């Protein structure tokens, strides 16, 4: 009875879920996506399980970049334990792809904000047959080359930046996208386009069995939880703004981050990278900077010897001015681009009329 009622309640939302899947596929450069998962860390754990299944369970080592968000690393480690998988966290430059490795997870941009792709590591991963999983920032993909265009097999992340408040960490709708050939291993709900008895287009939940109840530990996924309301919010945010406005939002975020970067460098501070989207890591000179920020309700990532700062789509020029004041430096306009030429996005996205009509 519960299943029937739930299915009926989903009926009117299916077109919006389809929009969500289209949005994710377009931005990540992948071929197929589900209609949300619980959160980004869970999506990473699901992607690891999916990669293990693709290897037929014959390999047991999973590599994770040390510059993946720490909460994601922790959830992946926890999920790996009952599956008897070994998780190795290291710098991607040190990854060794032997016969026991079935997949790897990297962050794009990295947790420290760096926008880069380790081409040599990618070549080794692909040559070994390892499944490449990328945890991506959805808004950044309006400006930087999507993972699907540089070799990713699975892309995961969350859609919080598309109109959903931070909410002290959640809830937010996560996503997972992959290649068409891996669709049978994709966890979660998938909305497909079919035909009704009259030959009219009809939407339905595709490739779905309640196997988590039937196959138990051998199921594609044991996590049934989606984030329906949050996926609807993120989807409609994209429908409302469309590709051009989303790009403008991303450009504004990147511009404000670039102002902070150029101001810090001009003021004599050491910043971790010239390639970034919305996050930078700056060497700490004055321990009182964090104290000043906290008094004004700015929360930095304290690395000990350095500070991590992220700018989001709600930030204003006034906010950046306050950050600059904390460091006692001057506002300096940026020169040049913060994205490497090889990683600038050149492909179109959100071209469907639903994203360009309202």
Where do the PLM segments sit?
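Short loop-beta-helix segment that forms the pyridoxal 5′-phosphate
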Residues: 15, 26-45
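General small-molecule cofactor/ligand-binding pocket signal
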Residues: 33, 86-90, 272, 301
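Conserved PLP-enzyme active-site core in the AAT-like
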Residues: 42-200, 264-265, 341, 355
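Buried hydrophobic positions in well-ordered alpha/beta secondary-structure cores of metabolic enzymes
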Residues: 24, 76-77, 104, 137, ...
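Active-site C-terminal subdomain of aminotransferase-like
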Residues: 162-263, 267, 271-274, 345
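Short, small-residue-biased leader/transition segments that mark boundaries at the very start
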Residues: 1-14
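Conserved C-terminal alpha-helix-loop-beta "cap" of PLP-dependent enzymes
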Residues: 244-326, 331-338
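ATP-dependent carboxylate/acyl-activation modules
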Residues: 9, 197, 201, 214-219, ...
């Amino acid at each position: 009875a519960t299943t029937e009622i739930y299915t009926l309640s989903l009926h009117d939302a299916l077109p919006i879920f389809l929009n969500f899947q289209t949005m994710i596929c377009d931005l990540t450069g992948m071929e197929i996506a589900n209609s949300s998962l619980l959160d980004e860390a869970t999506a990473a754990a699901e992607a690891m399980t999916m990669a293990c299944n693709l290897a037929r369970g014959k390999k047991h080592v999973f590599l994770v970049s040390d510059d993946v968000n720490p909460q994601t690393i922790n959830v992946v480690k926890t999920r790996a334990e009952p599956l008897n998988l070994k998780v190795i966290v290291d710098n991607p430059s040190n990854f060794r792809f032997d016969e026991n490795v079935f997949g790897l997870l990297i962050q794009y941009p990295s947790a420290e904000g760096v926008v880069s792709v380790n081409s040599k590591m990618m070549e080794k991963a692909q040559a070994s047959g390892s499944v490449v999983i990328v945890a991506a920032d959805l808004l950044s993909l309006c400006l930087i080359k999507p993972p699907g265009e540089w070799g990713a097999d699975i892309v995961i992340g969350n859609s919080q930046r598309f109109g959903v408040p931070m909410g002290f960490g959640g809830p937010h709708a996560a996503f997972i996208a992959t290649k068409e050939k891996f669709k049978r291993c994709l966890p979660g709900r998938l909305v497909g386009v079919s035909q009704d008895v009259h030959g009219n287009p009809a939407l339905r939940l595709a490739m779905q069995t309640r196997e988590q109840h039937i196959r138990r530990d051998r199921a594609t996924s044991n996590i049934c939880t989606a984030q329906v309301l949050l996926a609807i919010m993120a989807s409609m945010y994209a429908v409302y703004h469309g590709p051009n406005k989303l790009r403008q939002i991303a450009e504004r975020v990147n511009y404000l981050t670039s102002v902070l970067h150029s101001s810090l460098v001009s003021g004599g501070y050491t910043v971790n990278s010239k390639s970034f989207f919305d996050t930078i890591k700056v060497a700490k000179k004055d321990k009182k900077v964090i104290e000043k920020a906290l008094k004004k309700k700015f929360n930095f990532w304290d690395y000990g010897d350095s500070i991590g700062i992220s700018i989001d789509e709600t930030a204003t020029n006034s906010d950046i001015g306050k950050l600059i004041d904390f460091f006692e430096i001057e506002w300096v306009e940026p020169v040049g681009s913060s994205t490497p030429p090889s990683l600038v996005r050149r492909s179109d996205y959100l071209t469907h009329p639903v994203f360009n009509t309202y």
